[in-house]
Amino acid sequence: MGSQIIHNSQKPHVVCVPYPAQGHINPMMRVAKLLHARGFYVTFVNTVYNHNRFLRSRGSNALDGLPSFRFESIADGLPETDMDATQDITALCESTMKNCLAPFRELLQRINAGDNVPPVSCIVSDGCMSFTLDVAEELGVPEVLFWTTSGCAFLAYLHFYLFIEKGLCPLKDESYLTKEYLEDTVIDFIPTMKNVKLKDIPSFIRTTNPDDVMISFALRETERAKRASAIILNTFDDLEHDVVHAMQSILPPVYSVGPLHLLANREIEEGSEIGMMSSNLWKEEMECLDWLDTKTQNSVIYINFGSITVLSVKQLVEFAWGLAGSGKEFLWVIRPDLVAGEEAMVPPDFLMETKDRSMLASWCPQEKVLSHPAIGGFLTHCGWNSILESLSCGVPMVCWPFFADQQMNCKFCCDEWDVGIEIGGDVKREEVEAVVRELMDGEKGKKMREKAVEWQRLAEKATEHKLGSSVMNFETVVSKFLLGQKSQD
């Protein structure tokens, strides 16, 4: 009897497993913090590579955690390196798929054998780390999969099998990679999606290799998603209701629980121990906020291509001179590894010409930057976190998608949500200059800003009180799935 009482008094224990890239770790950290605030004991599992990057960027105590929020790590199976760069995504996907199951199983066995922590009662895993499902099933605990892409991109991934059936993938040869073919090929078989072209589909589809790793990975992970207890998406009902509704017939229950940064901000004090826990792999330069404080409202364009995008030297130079030619003030985040294979260096004469109206940083607190009154526009790679943060702050966008879900995100930003203007893939300084001016000063830019402010209102409505759609959905996922009884063998 006594042992039963002790067992019932133990906290539920969630193991959170993000895919090991910055844009996946941040939203998973928010989910983990929200669960911790609801009384869960949290184990947050990074790869050894990223665990070591955290320690280098944030100090040796950065991952000490709290008594009920612990960090663990598992090997990703790739050769060890000390570089502070984003790993090759294809190699990482292949390696996690093949190599992570055994170390993850061993980690959970070790946790469950310990005396000082409650037994693992549920798992929340990135949708791209579905090997975790095998362990959840072995333990008889529920698993919620978190797909960190947009709903529209996830729906496209769910239909990749049809591209193969219809002979659209792989492409027959390199000649099909032309702009004309990608723009002229209409895709009319994804539910709810209209006027979609092959160029808008997540970029992994653009392969001539019948054994392409990323196609195999997408097919495998979307198929395995059907085994989850439930699926959560970092979006909100007003933004992607039709898309999410279309998934419900082919998947376990799907819930919109975003924007997660708004949900977390509403519930977690920034200055609290849990609030101060950071998940950034790069050290943020806070000075950019001081610089923005000296600028007038809506006067600055912010440029950040995220944590994975790489540019050629030529593209970097074209962006630089386009920004210079626009005459606008700008804050530009240039990661050290932004240029493929070498250090990212902008032309010295560009620096001289723009020194009185620009600030360059290697990384910054993006959410704080986008919410700053001085920011009037955002030149973005269309990563989903960036788009959600921009919409949540009412900031319109210039869109330059790089890979993966970003093409689809760009399409919806520009054509469905009316908050974006696209720049062509082969960057030209004249186009950059013209589009930045249109965004900041033009009639189209003004309409986009008004629309962005409307989306801001709807994002806040979904997250700011207990009747918000995302708040209610999050509570449902917690009570119905994560706190549900262990499944019986």
Curated annotation (Swiss-Prot):
Alphabetical list of Pfam families matching this protein: UDPGT
Function: Involved in the O-glucosylation of trans-zeatin and dihydrozeatin. Also active in vitro on cis-zeatin. Not active on N-glucosylated substrates.
Keywords in alphabetical order: Glycosyltransferase, Transferase
Record-level Gene Ontology MF annotations: cis-zeatin O-beta-D-glucosyltransferase activity; glucuronosyltransferase activity; trans-zeatin O-beta-D-glucosyltransferase activity
Assigned EC number: 2.4.1.-
Entry binding sites for UDP-alpha-D-glucose: 307, 364-366, 381-389, 403-406
Family named by the database record: Belongs to the UDP-glycosyltransferase family.
Tissue-wise expression: Expressed in root tips, lateral root initials, root apex, shoots, leaf periphery, leaf primordia and flowers.
Domain of life according to the entry: Eukaryota
Record InterPro entries: UDP_glucos_trans (IPR002213), UDP_glycos_trans_CS (IPR035595)
Coiled-coil annotated spans: none
Protein name, per record: UDP-glycosyltransferase 85A1
